[in-house]
A protein has these predicted regions:
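Active-site-proximal alpha-helix that buttresses catalytic centers in soluble enzyme cores
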Residues: 1-252
Length: 252
């Protein structure tokens, strides 16, 4: 998929995990469309489940690109899959931004989704993350929970949906037993899919929607892209870069 028409600027390649859920795929496509309205040519690639892969998209472009890993924590996909895909593409002019999360913007979107689900001040919150075996990703999830806790004014517990312990249903049950309060699940997932569907059986009083297409998330993506474009310009001014070089930009 390609959207936008500002061909004079580097293309944006939004890299997501991938899902068999048609609703999830449509959501990622809709997010790309919203971003494209501000930045121009935007492509979507997936590292798992379905294609096209990042390397396929970057080979097709054969032009400067800014790659944004649309992951909420920096685990295996961010540290291993994305760099490998960039190298395999043979595209010499690719700038890779940090992963989307954790970020205060995402915490604000999580709070909005919780309120949509019926959460009120005083209700307990469990942050539901996919999970990872990478300690760096788990650290990112803890940071995300701390950011959300600053906004709710209360502790936010963490539960995992796919990898790691404790599992979301166990955390929900423990928090309810200990506090006697209503418990809501904040879905720390980008889109609908298998992981989000599991949250319906978590036993919570309410489950928030995934981050999805939200104006603040779109603005965050646009900001990351523009930081990447500035890096492209700086590199171009300094001369050509070696082939297969991957540049990781600082978090803005």
């Amino acid at each position: 998929m390609m959207s936008g028409s500002n061909s004079g600027r580097p293309a944006l390649v939004l890299v997501a995990h991938g899902t068999r859920s048609p609703r999830g795929v449509e959501l990622v496509a809709a997010l790309a469309e919203e971003v494209a309205a501000s930045v121009g040519p935007t492509r979507v690639a997936f590292v798992d489940v379905l294609g096209p892969s990042p390397s396929e998209v970057l080979r097709e472009l054969d032009a400067p690109a800014v790659v944004i890993p649309a992951f909420l924590a920096s685990g295996y996909h961010v540290h291993t899959d994305v760099p490998r895909e960039v190298a395999d593409s043979g595209n010499a002019d690719v700038h890779v931004t940090p992963a989307l999360g954790p970020d205060p913007v995402l915490a604000a979107v999580l709070l909005h989704r919780l309120r949509e689900a019926g959460w009120q001040s005083g209700d307990a919150v469990v942050l539901a993350a996919a999970g990872s075996s990478d300690p760096r990703a788990l650290t990112d999830v803890r940071r995300a929970a701390a950011m959300l806790a600053e906004l709710t004014g209360d502790r936010v517990e963490i539960g995992y949906v796919a990898t790691g312990e404790p599992r979301v249903p166990d955390v929900v049950a423990r928090v309810r037993d200990e506090s006697g309060r209503r418990v809501f699940v904040a879905s720390y997932l980008l889109a609908h899919g298998l992981f989000h569907s599991r949250l319906a059986d978590a036993g919570a009083d309410g489950v928030a929607e995934p981050l999805g297409v939200h104006a603040e998330l779109v603005r965050l993506l646009v900001s990351r892209y523009r930081a990447g474009v500035e890096a492209v310009r700086v590199t171009a001014g300094a001369g050509a870069a070696p082939r297969h070089r991957r540049r990781v930009l600082p978090v803005r």
